[in-house]
UniProtKB/Swiss-Prot annotation:
Species name: Vibrio vulnificus (strain YJ016)
Main location class: cytoplasm
Region (Phosphoribosyl-ATP pyrophosphohydrolase): 123-211
Protein name from the UniProt record: Histidine biosynthesis bifunctional protein HisIE
Family: In the N-terminal section; belongs to the PRA-CH family.
GO biological process: L-histidine biosynthetic process
Metabolic or biological pathway: Amino-acid biosynthesis; L-histidine biosynthesis; L-histidine from 5-phospho-alpha-D-ribose 1-diphosphate: step 2/9; Amino-acid biosynthesis; L-histidine biosynthesis; L-histidine from 5-phospho-alpha-D-ribose 1-diphosphate: step 3/9
Keywords from the UniProt entry: Amino-acid biosynthesis, ATP-binding, Cytoplasm, Histidine biosynthesis, Hydrolase, Multifunctional enzyme, Nucleotide-binding
Cross-referenced CDD domains: NTP-PPase_HisIE_like
Catalytic activity entry: 1-(5-phospho-beta-D-ribosyl)-ATP + H2O = 1-(5-phospho-beta-D-ribosyl)-5'-AMP + diphosphate + H(+); 1-(5-phospho-beta-D-ribosyl)-5'-AMP + H2O = 1-(5-phospho-beta-D-ribosyl)-5-[(5-phospho-beta-D-ribosylamino)methylideneamino]imidazole-4-carboxamide
GO cellular component: cytoplasm
EC number in record: 3.5.4.19, 3.6.1.31
Catalytic class of the enzyme: hydrolase
Length: 211
């Protein structure tokens, strides 16, 4: 039994299966962006299979069988970790989604809701866009041209924008400070992507230092 399977098995023992009539609600959340993707139900077999395979599996109440998300579309949900709420009757499942989660082709099952997206979700989407630009035609966008010019040029831009931020702060122009900070963060994100990193790596380091 893998470590992940053992952890899931231990979690299953804590669930109040009688209270949930054998089906525990499972809220699925993107591990990187914290965006809620979907909600499904798991019985004990679905939970065990999720732990064994590392791919999120539900119990389909309509088909009355186990259903691994993405088994036909390929848009699987790769398990990162899961936890129980305080009443031991609802799961929070954190995943790395491969492709869109909703059967309609949207990122989440709530994409039709006009609710305002969180800043972290938006930032994650920006990082995905920047990552896609790495393989784009250098003439197609400024970002693609930066990648084409290499790490040295990207690093130079980060340095230049850092100076611009400092000058804006010194001048006391708050509007200019916001604009220059946006430029700095954008170029920093490009540099991180160039090096195979993301803002999550930076955030994790900040969390580590905060302990």
């Amino acid at each position: 039994m893998s470590v992940k399977a053992a952890e899931v098995s231990s979690l299953a023992e804590r669930i109040n299966w009688e209270k949930v009539d054998g089906l525990v609600p499972a809220i699925v959340q993107d591990f990187q962006s914290s965006q809620v993707l979907m909600m499904g139900y798991m019985n004990q077999d679905a939970l065990a299979k999720t732990g064994e395979t590392g791919q999120v599996t539900f119990f389909s109440r309509t088909k009355e069988r186990l259903w691994t998300k993405g088994e036909t579309s390929g848009n699987v949900l790769q398990l990162v970790n899961m936890s129980l709420d305080c009443d031991n009757d609802t799961l929070l499942v954190k995943v790395n989604p491969i492709g869109p989660t909703c059967h309609t082709g949207t990122t989440t099952c709530w994409d039709g809701d006009p609710q305002e997206e969180s800043q972290m979700v938006w930032l994650h989407q920006l990082e995905q866009l920047l990552a896609a630009r790495k393989s784009a035609d250098p003439d197609s966008s400024y970002t693609a041209s930066l990648y084409a010019r290499g790490t040295k040029r990207i690093s130079q831009k980060v340095g230049e924008e850092g100076v611009e931020v400092a000058l804006a702060a010194t001048s006391g122009d708050k509007a200019e400070l916001v604009c220059e900070s946006a430029d700095l963060i954008y170029h920093l994100l490009v540099l991180l992507q160039d090096q195979g990193l993301s803002m999550n790596d930076v955030i994790n380091k900040l969390k580590e230092r905060h302990k």
